[in-house]
Swiss-Prot record:
Keywords, alphabetical: Cobalamin biosynthesis, Glutamine amidotransferase
Stretches assigned to the GATase cobBQ-type domain: 251-448
Family: Belongs to the CobB/CobQ family. CobQ subfamily.
Any one of the GO BP annotations: cobalamin biosynthetic process
UniProt KW Lyase keyword: no
Gene3D superfamilies in alphabetical order: 3.40.50.880, P-loop containing nucleotide triphosphate hydrolases
GO molecular function (one): catalytic activity
Active site, renumbered: 332, 440
Keyword Oxidoreductase: no
Physiological role: Catalyzes amidations at positions B, D, E, and G on adenosylcobyrinic A,C-diamide. NH(2) groups are provided by glutamine, and one molecule of ATP is hydrogenolyzed for each amidation.
Involved pathway(s): Cofactor biosynthesis; adenosylcobalamin biosynthesis
Name of the protein described by the UniProt record: Cobyric acid synthase
UniProt-listed PROSITE patterns: GATASE_COBBQ (PS51274)
């Protein structure tokens, strides 16, 4: 029988996704066929499977930790917020509809049977399933239609481990309060607690651990220290917590504009891992002053974020920075914003709007979303600081609902191989100071990334780095470091799975 264990949290961003990846890595190292599963994920960081399905990035990197190919069954429901009240609903990797929160809450019971069927299908193929909840199981206003926390644990008939973040303070209150708000049958599923992100001498916690175990009857399985591991974050909460402010001095500074609806900021993890690069996510115009490159990232609401750029003064500052000779790059929604004109009758309904005008392009939004993994080749001739990237192979994925047409004065940045056909993508100006593409994951291509960074180094009179950093090997090292730390600090996971597994 397939064994399963589920991680739920006292709140969002307590570290469930990373610890789930660590469990996937441990079971993989121990020779068990393991898969991650999250029934419903709300995130703007998504990726594309080999068969063109869209799923949450968290389950993609958990699958990588487990040594398997990501499968959309690992995340059957993906919610991508388009505003404070609306979200795009992606079912089994394809866009279904847009809904507000109330409509989706009413819709959830219809998903329960489908989610269970998908889970059972996955469980038949693996020895272990590592499930992840969302937010907290103590959201009592959502309990009656829950499909992602205790509702999912009930469907999978699996034990639950509660993860609590001590770094934000109030960890014992969070543990006690969460367990107190659960129904008895839900509380009985919780077989242990992990206290996560601890800094300092763990001996200071012992008396508190004894008391919380006595008060709740639930054992603390371990205290995970704050780990300096470089792994993906599920969504923008990490940006709000200043994790990526990048204060360490490096030769090259890259400023990424933190749009209100920023998506796929995992595009820049490989850049951040470069030994000579400092990444800074910025929201204030004055923060552009020391940038060697400015990047406009993806957006789930392009025109809304473009309006924010103008209202915040960021657009004027970005254009001024560009006039001073600093290159500006756009990816997906950011690429669209760099153009002359955006025609949107789909996403926002705002019609025709002017872009920033750095690329002579016109973008028209469409109803159908392109979701595919692609191989590509950079154009054979690229100007200025991009010249070393000319002709290089790159790989990535597309997630967009717009088509961008180049006008006079722009050259194609690369050629994609999409479904067996060659497709032109991206645009670059003659001076190389404005460059855009729809290709997410571009910087995971090591040779391209080093060529770009060395081009920026040359602009500053710095010698190039001859050694190319291998991001794939770096990720493997991070998975192994995480697994080693979890083995050292957490007990009884195997015992819990073996003793508390129920037949589905």
């Amino acid at each position: 029988m397939t064994q399963a264990v589920m991680l739920q949290g006292t709140a969002s961003d307590v570290g469930k996704s990373v610890l789930a990846a660590g469990l996937c890595r441990i079971f993989y190292q121990d020779g068990l066929r393991t898969a991650p599963f999250k029934s419903q994920n709300m995130a703007l960081n998504s990726g594309i499977t080999s068969d063109g399905k869209e799923m949450g990035r968290a389950q993609i990197f958990q699958a990588e930790a487990a040594g398997i190919t990501p499968d959309v069954r690992m995340n059957p429901v993906l919610l991508k917020p388009t505003s404070d009240r609306q979200a795009q609903v992606v079912l089994m990797g394809k866009v279904a509809t847009n809904m507000d929160a109330v409509s989706y809450h009413d819709y959830k019971p219809r998903l329960r049977e489908q989610i269970l069927a998908v889970y059972n299908s996955l469980a038949q193929e693996y020895d272990v399933i590592v499930l992840e909840g969302a937010g907290s199981p103590a959201e009592i206003n959502l309990r009656d239609r829950d499909i992602v926390n205790m509702g999912m644990a009930e469907m999978a008939q699996c034990p639950v481990i509660l993860v609590a973040d001590i770094d934000r303070g109030g960890v014992f209150a969070a543990i006690y309060g969460t367990l107190a708000l659960l129904h008895k049958q839900e509380r009985d599923r919780v077989k242990g607690v992990i206290i996560n992100k601890f800094r300092g001498d763990v001996a200071l916690l012992y008396s508190g651990i004894e008391q919380i175990e006595s008060l709740t009857g639930v054992p603390v399985l371990g205290v995970m220290p704050w780990l300096d591991v470089d792994l993906e974050d599920e969504d923008g909460v990490a940006l709000q917590n200043d994790k990526y402010r990048g204060n360490a001095p490096r030769d090259i500074t890259i400023a990424i504009v933190q749009l209100p609806h920023i998506s796929n900021f995992t595009d820049f993890n490989a850049l951040a891992a470069q030994p000579d690069v400092r990444i800074r996510y910025i929201r204030r115009p004055e923060a552009l002053t020391d940038a060697d490159l400015v990047i406009l990232p993806g957006s789930k609401n392009t025109l809304s974020d473009l309006a924010w750029l103008r209202e915040s003064g960021m657009a004027d500052a970005l254009l001024q920075t560009h006039r001073q000779g600093v290159p500006v790059m756009g990816i997906c929604g950011g690429y669209q914003m760099l153009g002359d004109t955006i025609v949107d009758e789909v996403e926002s309904g705002l019609g025709t709007q002017p872009g920033l005008g750095l690329l002579n392009t016109i973008t028209r939004f469409a109803q159908d979303k392109i979701t595919t993994q692609v191989n590509a080749t950079m154009s054979g001739e690229l100007p200025s600081w991009l010249a070393a990237a000319a002709g290089l192979p790159v790989r990535g994925y597309e997630i967009h609902m717009g088509e961008t047409v180049l006008q006079e004065g722009c050259c194609t940045a690369m050629t994609l191989q999409r479904n067996g056909c060659s497709v032109a993508d991206g645009a670059v100006t003659a001076d190389g100071l404005a460059f855009g593409t729809y290709l997410h994951g571009l910087f995971d291509s090591d040779a391209f990334t080093r060529a770009v960074v060395n081009g920026l180094r040359a602009r500053k009179g710095l010698a190039p780095w001859e050694t190319t950093f291998c991001y794939a090997e770096h990720k493997v090292r991070q998975f192994d470091l995480l697994a080693e730390a979890m083995r050292q600090h957490i007990d009884k996971i195997y015992t819990i799975m073996q003793q508390h597994q129920e037949p589905v």
